[in-house]
Amino acid sequence: MHLEGKYLLKAPQAQVWDFVSKPEEIAKCLPDLQSFEMKDSRSFTVTVKVGISFVRGNFKFDFTLLDQKPPSHSRFEAIGKGAGVSIRLSASMDLKITEDDGTELEWQADAEMGGLLAEISPSLIQGSTSRFTQQFFDCVKSKLESSG
């Protein structure tokens, strides 16, 4: 499954980069976050509560930062497991300065899902994923624009 999106933020690129390059800050915006643990400077683990159709429970995701080019590009991967499901995610994010000195955050992600998720309608998964990402980016936007 491929996902992508753009968000306009009323915050300078340096401020956005400072926020999105800190896993402990990003984790605070994950909907239904249960736990967060930094493993080292390039990897961390989160546990989130998930509920899509009959797939419900806590999912553990191990994130690894693969490539960072401050202040404009980051790429990472995550491997998640829980409730008879496996997910492999690779994602990237690019930050661009806008004409009004704000920042455009453009992201894309590809997810491979196995186990019980294969039994669920793709449109149901897409809908749940869209709600999750909207909540996440609304939180990021709120934190950045209220701290500026």
Predicted regions and their residues:
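Intrinsic-disorder/low-complexity, polar/charged segments enriched in Ser/Thr/Lys/Arg/Asp/Glu/Gln
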Residues: 2-6, 43-45, 58-60, 73, ...
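Hydrophobic residues in beta-strands and at strand termini
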Residues: 9, 48, 78, 95-97
